[in-house]
UniProtKB/Swiss-Prot annotation:
Protein's name according to its UniProt entry: Phenylalanine--tRNA ligase alpha subunit
GO CC terms, sorted: cytoplasm
Gene that this polypeptide is encoded by: pheS
Subcellular localization: Cytoplasm
GO molecular function: ATP binding; magnesium ion binding; phenylalanine-tRNA ligase activity; tRNA binding
InterPro entries xrefs: aa-tRNA-synth_II, aa-tRNA-synth_II/BPL/LPL, Phe-tRNA-synth_IIc_asu, Phe-tRNA_ligase_II_N, Phe_tRNA_ligase_alpha1_bac, Phenylalanyl-tRNA_Synthase, tRNA-bd_arm
Cofactor annotation comment: Binds 2 magnesium ions per tetramer.
Sequence similarity: Belongs to the class-II aminoacyl-tRNA synthetase family. Phe-tRNA synthetase alpha subunit type 1 subfamily.
Source organism per UniProt: Shewanella sp. (strain MR-7)
Entry-linked PANTHER family: PHENYLALANINE--TRNA LIGASE, MITOCHONDRIAL (PTHR11538:SF41), PHENYLALANYL-TRNA SYNTHETASE (PTHR11538)
Length: 327
């Protein structure tokens, strides 16, 4: 028994002196392992009398528990000290501002298109899409644009061959819709269009939204009402709006629409008119029964006016300093 007591006392001292977890694990093996000192003491049971064995066995178990308890306490203490040292080394100043997440935003042109689609969607207009590579029938002929019209010139239009080109307006979508669907029709057709022009207010590629309504007894007063409401909704103010007589091959009568700018000058924002009877005939719609109105607007121009941008080219230069202003 004296030897067992000495082993326990020795183990407890060594455990207190251990400086790391590796040393504690070595102590555990030396005293409690299969070949450890406490395990060796159990082998002495064979030399004891039956009367002595119970007391000796109990003493060995108590010794094992004492050593194991001390090991557990010392391990917990070292782990706690290790964690505290780590936390001190990695101390965080909680008063510092957090790292912000850079959230993306819609491009201003996309925002404008969505705003237009939302307004006309509430009036029952559906959104239609069409090909950007267009044939001369859908881009010119069906729109009552004569063979010698300036819009067909090489310096205005990007041709692949005499019959195939990049579309110069989204009006071809209206033609394709009227070819496949019967009146009444209410559609808008947003999309990219292409013209051979590049300066402060023009780019070779830009976006248009064109609208078409075909039904019985459609008149110019309805067109004026729709566009007047749209412009007030888009610019979110009660603007002065005027309709100027103009000419477009595909509408008759035709008009250009201006709004009064903050500088006291009229600004052109879109074109419109009653669908020309020849356009209706080209797609098999009887102009004696049906009439309609159409309008078209440059998305970039509307965006420039809404946000006060002076150079249209800024929308396509992908300068984040510019684009982040529209989040």
């Amino acid at each position: 028994m004296q030897q067992l007591t000495e082993i326990v006392e020795q183990a407890l001292v060594i455990i207190d002196q251990a400086s790391d977890l590796k040393a504690l694990d070595d102590i555990r093996v030396d005293y409690l392992g299969k070949k450890g000192k406490i395990t060796d003491m159990m082998k002495m049971m064979g030399s004891l009398s039956p009367e002595e064995k119970p007391a000796f066995g109990q003493a060995v178990n108590d010794a094992k528990q004492a050593i194991q308890q001390k090991l557990t306490e010392r391990i917990d203490g070292l782990k706690s000290a290790e964690l505290e040292a780590k936390l001190i080394a990695e101390k965080i100043d909680v008063t510092l501002p957090g790292r912000t997440i850079d959230i993306g935003g819609l491009h201003p042109v996309t925002r404008t298109i969505e705003r237009i689609e939302t307004f006309f969607g509430e009036l029952g207009f559906s959104v239609k899409q069409g090909p950007e590579i267009e044939d001369d029938f859908h881009n010119f002929d069906a729109l009552n644009i004569s063979e010698h019209h300036p819009a067909r010139a090489d310096h205005d239009t990007f041709y692949f061959n005499p019959k195939l080109m990049l579309r110069t307006q989204t009006s071809g979508v209206q033609i394709r819709t009227m070819e496949t669907e019967k009146p009444p029709l209410r559609i808008i057709s947003p999309g990219r269009v292409y013209r051979n022009d590049y300066d402060q207010t023009h780019t070779p590629m830009f976006h248009q939204v064109e609208g078409l309504l075909v039904d019985e007894n459609v008149n110019f007063a309805e067109l004026k009402g729709v566009l007047h409401d749209f412009l007030r909704n888009f610019f979110e103010e009660d603007l002065q709006v005027r309709f100027r007589p103009s000419y477009f091959p595909f509408t008759e009568p035709s008009a250009e629409v201006d709004v009064m700018g903050k500088n006291g000058k009229w600004l052109e924002v879109l074109g419109c008119g009653m669908v020309h009877p020849n356009v209706l005939r080209s797609v098999g719609i009887d102009p004696e029964k049906y009439s309609g109105f159409a309008f078209g607007m440059g998305v970039e121009r509307l965006t420039m006016l809404r946000y006060g941008v002076n150079d249209l080219r800024a929308f396509f230069e992908n300068d984040l300093r510019f684009l982040k202003q529209f989040k």
